[in-house]
Amino acid sequence: MPSEGRCWETLKALRSSDKGRLCYYRDWLLRREDVLEECMSLPKLSSYSGWVVEHVLPHMQENQPLSETSPSSTSASALDQPSFVPKSPDASSAFSPASPATPNGTKGKDESQHTESMVLQSSRGIKVEGCVRMYELVHRMKGTEGLRLWQEEQERKVQALSEMASEQLKRFDEWKELKQHKEFQDLREVMEKSSREALGHQEKLKAEHRHRAKILNLKLREAEQQRVKQAEQERLRKEEGQIRLRALYALQEEMLQLSQQLDASEQHKALLKVDLAAFQTRGNQLCSLISGIIRASSESSYPTAESQAEAERALREMRDLLMNLGQEITRACEDKRRQDEEEAQVKLQEAQMQQGPEAHKEPPAPSQGPGGKQNEDLQVKVQDITMQWYQQLQDASMQCVLTFEGLTNSKDSQAKKIKMDLQKAATIPVSQISTIAGSKLKEIFDKIHSLLSGKPVQSGGRSVSVTLNPQGLDFVQYKLAEKFVKQGEEEVASHHEAAFPIAVVASGIWELHPRVGDLILAHLHKKCPYSVPFYPTFKEGMALEDYQRMLGYQVKDSKVEQQDNFLKRMSGMIRLYAAIIQLRWPYGNRQEIHPHGLNHGWRWLAQILNMEPLSDVTATLLFDFLEVCGNALMKQYQVQFWKMLILIKEDYFPRIEAITSSGQMGSFIRLKQFLEKCLQHKDIPVPKGFLTSSFWRS
C-alpha cells in the first residue's frame, strides 16, 4: 500500500502548513447569521485599527531599510500589495504551539517580539479578527479568573497541605519524641536493671566480705581468747608455782624447826629406851628430801603439785616422828616420875617404920597452905620441850605478821581495799558456822579452802583471791586463825554446843593447810596460856597490867575484867581446843593421821596434872576439857585414862581443894561431881552438841 503511505505524508504536511495550524471554532455556525451579516455590510475600520497603527506600522517601517526603497516605490508597492495587519495572538499561537497564551500583563512582551507583516484585509475580515480577538480577550480573562480561582484553590490546598504537613510534622515530632522517650525509658530500665544487678552483685560481695570478715573476726577472737586463756593459764601456773614455792619454803622452814626440836631431845637421851639416833637419821633424811625437792623445783622454774604433796608427806612424817618421840619422852618422863614416886614412897615407908607409930600421922596438905610449904613433886613451870614448842609457835606467828606488814601498813587505797576484801572473805564464813545443816557447813568449808588455795571466791558481791597481793595468803591465814580462836572466845563461851561445828571446820582446814593450824595454836596459846599448859611467871620490872594480860585477862583503861568473864572466855577456848583434837573433817583423807590429835589431849592432861593447880582456874578448865574430850580419850586410852581419873580424884582433888576459897568452890564441886559420876557409871557421856552422822546428811 504505497499510495496509502503517501496520503499520510500529505496530511502531515498539510497539518504542518500555516493553514493547518489555524484554529477553527466549531461553534461558529451558532453565529452564522452574524458572520453573514458582517460579510454583507460595508467594510469599516476595526476597533483595533488604532492599536495596529500605533503598534504594528511603526515597527514595519523601521524594519524596511531606507536604501532599498524609495518613497515612490514604497508608496506604489503599498498601493499594489494588500494591506498588512499583525497576526492575532491566537493565530500566532496556532502557528506556533510552543508559545502559550499570556495574560494582559504579558502584552509588552508580545509586543517586543517580532511581528509579521500581514496584508490589510477587508473591513469584514478585520471585524472578524477583532471579534476573534475580543473573544480571545474574554476567554483570556475567563482563563485568568479561573486561573486566579485555581491559584486560590491551590493556595488553599497548599495551605491545607501545609497545615496537614505541619500537623503531621508535629505528630512525627511527637512520635519521634515518644520513640526517643521510650528508647530513653528502655535505656534507663536497662541501666537500672544493670545497676540493680551490679548493686545485687555488690551486696552479694559485701555479704560475702562480711561473712568472711565475721569468720575472720571469730577466728581472731578465738585466737585472742586462746591467747588470753593461755596467758591466764600461764599466769595462774606461775602464781600457783610461786604459791607452791612459798609453801615449800615454809615446809622447809618448819622441817628445820622440827629438826632442831629433834636435836634438842638429846637431853632426854638417858631416859629413852629407844635409839634416838634412828629418829635423828630419819629426820635428816626428810630434811634432805625437802631440800632436794626445792632444788629440783628451782631448776624446773616452778614446783609441781606432786612435789608439794611429797614435801607435805615428808613434813607430816617428820611431825609424826617428832610426836612419837615426844610420846616416848613423855612416857619415859612418866615412868621416871612414877619410879621416883615409888622410890619416895619406899623411902617414906622405911622412914615411917623406923620412926614408929608417929609416922602414921596424917601428912601435911600437898599444896602450900597456911604455914605449910609447896609439895616438891609438882612444878609450876612447864617442861622445856613444851616451852620450846610454845615459843616456836609464837615466833612463827610473829614472822607471819612481819610478812604481811607491807599490806597492813600500806597507804594505797587499792591495797587497803584488797586488805578489807581479804579480811571479810576470811572471817565472814567462820562467823556463819552453825549447826543448821551439814551441807551448809560443807559450803563454808569449801569456800575457805578455795580462798586458801588461791581460787577466787565471792565476798560482798566481788570476786576475791589471795593472788591479788603477794602477801595476801599470809594475811588470810593469820586472820582466819585469829577468827577461829575469837569464835571460841566469844561464841563457844556463850553456847557450848557451837564448839563442835567450829572445831570440825578448823580441823579440816588444819589438815589441808598446816600453817593455819600452827597459827590457831599460836593465837590460842597467846590468849589462853593454860591451853599450853603454861603459867606465866611475874618478872621483876614487869608492869602488873602486862602480867595480867600474859595470864589471859583483858585490861582496858587500867581496869581488869571480872573473874567470871575471864573464866567464861578461857572455858570457851579450852572447849574449842578439846573439840579440835578429837574431830576430823568427814570428807577428808581418813588414811592420814590427825594433824593435832588426841595424843596432844593426853599430853595436855598429863602436863596440867604435873603442875600446881590454880585457884578456880584449874578446876574450871579440867571440867570443860573432860566434858568435851573425856569420851574420846576414854575410847582411845581406856584403862590408862581411868587410872588418870582415879589419880585426879585421889591425888589432885585434895590439892585443888586446899587452895580454893569458900567463895570459889563452885567450879571445884562441879568437877568433883562430874568425875564421881563418871567413875560410878564407868562411862563418860558423849558431850552435848556432838555432830552425829545424821547431821552430815542434812
From Swiss-Prot:
Region annotated Disordered sits at: 63-121, 332-375
Instruction: Name the Gene3D superfamilies for this protein.
Output: GLE1-like
Query: What processes in GO biological process is this protein linked to?
Result: mRNA export from nucleus; nucleocytoplasmic transport; poly(A)+ mRNA export from nucleus; protein transport
Chain intervals for the UniProt region annotation (Interaction with NUP42): 656-698
Listed name of the protein = mRNA export factor GLE1
Give me the gene this protein comes from. GLE1
- TM ranges: none
Chain coiled-coil ranges: 151-277, 305-356
**Sites of the modification Phosphoserine?**
S41, S88, S99
What ranges does the record give for the region Interaction with NUP155, renumbered to this chain? 1-29
What does the record note on quaternary structure? Associated with the NPC, however it may not be a stable component of the NPC complex since it shuttles between the nucleus and the cytoplasm. Interacts with nuclear pore complex proteins NUP155 and NUP42. Isoform 2 does not interact with NUP42. Able to form a heterotrimer with NUP155 and NUP42 in vitro.
Tell me the superkingdom of the source: Eukaryota
Any one Pfam family here would be: GLE1
Residues covered by region (Mediates the shuttling between the nucleus and the cytoplasm): 444-483
Regions of compositional bias (Low complexity) in chain numbering:
65-79, 86-103
Which Gene Ontology molecular function entries are recorded, alphabetically? Answer: identical protein binding; inositol hexakisphosphate binding; phospholipid binding; translation initiation factor binding
- Taxonomically, what lineage is the organism? Eukaryota, Metazoa, Chordata, Craniata, Vertebrata
Key words of the record: Coiled coil, Cytoplasm, Disease variant, mRNA transport, Nuclear pore complex, Nucleus, Phosphoprotein, Protein transport, Translocation, Transport
According to the UniProt entry, which disease involves this protein? Lethal congenital contracture syndrome 1: A form of lethal congenital contracture syndrome, an autosomal recessive disorder characterized by degeneration of anterior horn neurons, extreme skeletal muscle atrophy, and congenital non-progressive joint contractures (arthrogryposis). The contractures can involve the upper or lower limbs and/or the vertebral column, leading to various degrees of flexion or extension limitations evident at birth. LCCS1 patients manifest early fetal hydrops and akinesia, micrognathia, pulmonary hypoplasia, pterygia, and multiple joint contractures.
Q: What's the stated role of this polypeptide?
A: Required for the export of mRNAs containing poly(A) tails from the nucleus into the cytoplasm. May be involved in the terminal step of the mRNA transport through the nuclear pore complex (NPC).
Provide a GO CC annotation, any one. nuclear pore cytoplasmic filaments
The protein's organism comes out as Homo sapiens (Human)
What protein family does this chain belong to?
Answer: Belongs to the GLE1 family.
Q: Which InterPro entries does the protein's record reference? A: GLE1 (IPR012476), GLE1-like_sf (IPR038506)
Where is the protein localized?
Nucleus; Cytoplasm
